[in-house]
């Protein structure tokens, strides 16, 4: 029944009701000139050609032709909302960041949830990591915590990131998703085992965006007012409780309501059911990092909670839907390099790579002045620098202030109090191979200690159900990796694959290589 529709379905109805007492606006061109007729083009006679003087038509079509901006290369499908972060516990002994200044302080935030590999029109219910990015609008500029719904990631070296994403996207010739590409990469990079295991567990398909946790994933550095620093990780735990979708429900929803997560978030906020997350940190001292049993900056691993317990900090609350999706969600740009004083980067290689990649892709997608777009603008800080001009400069371009530094005319000066914390580094410079930095211990703990028997069963079924479409030699490599985690893990997956392969014989012939070549020798070794 139309009378019982949800707020998202009734958006146009509500918009009209809100303007019931107002007269309709006068229709104009983009330049504000009134339009006399929006239904008929100007022609030479009723059946004649169009005239170039029809500026109503050319204004409309020229803008329409340019409506689309480049799609995000990853995290293209997303939902956004706005709200606040409130401090509930004092952590000023760890960080001088103004966002944590005192208990009760509220900071405006913007949040974007997303899937990773799919295009902007893809379903919300696919098995895929979820982006969970938070923009804090602080007095010292924006802080972007660009996280996911998992505390780990597939790789630990940013040089692999383009290849990893290519393997999850579409085949360059067929333009189809390709299990060979996905599993070939994962099987050749066993550091992905932890994230792959999480992805194919029950938490791989969250029930919308409100019922999942968020994580900064990387290791960061906190610096207090005395210049003392610690390493930290950020966690935000859902107050709605964890809920996941079964494979069957996810498949059904992908057909019936592919925008399920977007709709659920919008309707919850529109009806006053504001979602929230409790914000925590883990803290590790520099001396603890030196004696840690593995690299504390490795994003494929977690910090054990029994050794580094969660410390409560505050609450994230979302209480406003976007006024316009394109303006406030499609154009929002999250950048891990946006860190106010008191929050800094660690030597985490993946984080270091993202410090360059994210602002670089924003400049491509939105232009060099993307920080002037209202949703990205650090509106609670005064921006004063020596950057000028460029496409889509939408503000006063800092007027007549000097555009060079140093100068003698009272223009902006740097602040020594904002200097980064000094860090000692190794003098040895080379390309360090980290491919075999214990890829199985924490995965084994996840499989044996975190999952129960039913969850292990579903995990293996989910993996085998996806891996079965890859070629046999790739299946064998993947199963070998799972067996190195735990024999039971690999054995279960192999047993399920054997059933699939008996029902649907595989063709193990793959890319042709010349007999006797180095590629042929390598492929023989893989079989």
Swiss-Prot record:
Give the sites modified to Phosphothreonine.
511
User: Which biological process terms from the Gene Ontology are attached to this UniProt entry?
Assistant: hydrogen peroxide catabolic process; positive regulation of cell division; response to hydrogen peroxide
**According to its UniProt record, where is this protein mainly located?**
other
- What superkingdom heads the lineage? Eukaryota
Q: Where is this motif: Microbody targeting signal?
A: 524-527
- Report the cofactors: heme; NADP(+)
Which parts of the sequence carry Phosphoserine? Answer: 9, 417, 422, 515, 517
Look up the EC number in the record and give it: 1.11.1.6
Q: Which cell locations does it reside in?
A: Peroxisome matrix
Q: Where does NADP(+) bind?
A: 194, 201, 203, 213, 237, 303, 305-306
- According to the UniProt record, list the residues that bear N6-succinyllysine: 13, 221, 306, 480
What's a Pfam family this protein contains? Catalase-rel
The positions flagged as active site in the entry are 75, 148
Top enzyme class: oxidoreductase
Binding annotation for heme: 358
Q: Which terms are listed as keywords in the entry?
A: Acetylation, Heme, Hydrogen peroxide, Iron, Metal-binding, Mitogen, NADP, Oxidoreductase, Peroxidase, Peroxisome, Phosphoprotein
N6-acetyllysine modification sites are: 233, 306, 480, 499
Q: How does it assemble?
A: Homotetramer. Interacts (via microbody targeting signal) with PEX5, monomeric form interacts with PEX5, leading to its translocation into peroxisomes.
Annotated family: Belongs to the catalase family.
- Name the chain's protein: Catalase
Natural source organism: Callithrix jacchus
Gene behind the chain: CAT
């Amino acid at each position: 029944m139309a009378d019982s529709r949800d707020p998202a379905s009734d958006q146009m109805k509500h918009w009209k009701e809100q303007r019931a007492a107002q007269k309709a606006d006068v229709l104009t061109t983009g330049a504000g000139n009134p339009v006399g007729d929006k239904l008929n083009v100007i022609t030479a006679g009723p059946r004649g050609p169009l005239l170039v003087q029809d500026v109503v038509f050319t204004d409309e079509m020229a803008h329409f032709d340019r409506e689309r901006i480049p799609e995000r290369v990853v995290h293209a499908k997303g939902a956004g909302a706005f709200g606040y972060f409130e401090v509930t516990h004092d952590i000023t002994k760890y960080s001088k960041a103004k966002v944590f200044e005192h208990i009760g302080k509220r900071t405006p935030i913007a949040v974007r949830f997303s899937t990773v590999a799919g295009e902007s029109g893809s379903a919300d219910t696919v098995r895929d990591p979820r982006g969970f990015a938070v923009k804090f609008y602080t007095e010292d500029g924006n802080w972007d915590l660009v996280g996911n719904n998992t505390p780990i990631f597939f790789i630990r070296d940013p040089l692999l990131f383009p290849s990893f994403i290519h393997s999850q996207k579409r085949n360059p010739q067929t333009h189809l998703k390709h299990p060979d590409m996905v599993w070939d990469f994962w099987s050749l990079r066993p550091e992905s085992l932890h994230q792959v295991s999480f992805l194919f567990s029950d938490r791989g398909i969250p029930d919308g965006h409100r019922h999942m946790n968020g994580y900064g994933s990387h290791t960061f550095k906190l610096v207090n007012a005395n210049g003392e620093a610690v390493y930290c990780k950020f966690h935000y735990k859902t107050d709605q409780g964890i809920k996941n979708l079964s494979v069957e429900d996810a498949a059904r929803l992908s057909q019936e309501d592919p925008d399920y997560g977007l709709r659920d978030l919008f309707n919850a906020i529109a009806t006053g059911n504001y979602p929230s997350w409790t914000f925590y940190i883990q803290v590790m001292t520099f001396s603890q990092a030196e004696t840690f049993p593995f690299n504390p900056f490795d994003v494929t691993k977690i910090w054990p909670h029994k050794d580094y317990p969660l410390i409560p900090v505050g609450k994230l609350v979302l209480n406003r839907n976007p006024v316009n999706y394109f303006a406030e969600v499609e154009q929002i740009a999250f950048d891990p390099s946006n860190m106010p004083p008191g929050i800094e980067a660690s030597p985490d290689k993946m984080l270091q790579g993202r410090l360059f990649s994210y602002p670089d892709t924003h400049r491509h997608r939105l232009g060099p002045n993307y920080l002037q777009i209202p949703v990205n603008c650090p509106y609670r800080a005064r921006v004063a620098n020596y950057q000028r001009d460029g496409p889509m400069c939408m503000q006063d371009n800092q007027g007549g202030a000097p555009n060079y530094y140093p100068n003698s005319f009272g223009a902006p000066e740097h602040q020594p109090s904002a200097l980064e914390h000094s860090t000692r580094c190794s003098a040895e410079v080379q390309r360090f191979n980290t491919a075999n930095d214990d890829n199985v211990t924490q995965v084994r703990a996840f499989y044996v200690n975190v999952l129960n028997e039913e969850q292990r069963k579903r995990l293996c079924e989910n993996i085998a159900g996806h891996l079965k479409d890859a070629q046999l030699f790739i299946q064998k490599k993947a199963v070998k990796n799972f067996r190195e985690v735990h024999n039971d893990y690999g054995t279960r997956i192999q047993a399920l694959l054997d059933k699939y392969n008996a029902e649907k014989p595989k063709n193990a012939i793959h890319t042709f290589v010349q007999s006797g070549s180095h590629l042929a020798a390598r492929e023989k070794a893989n079989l």
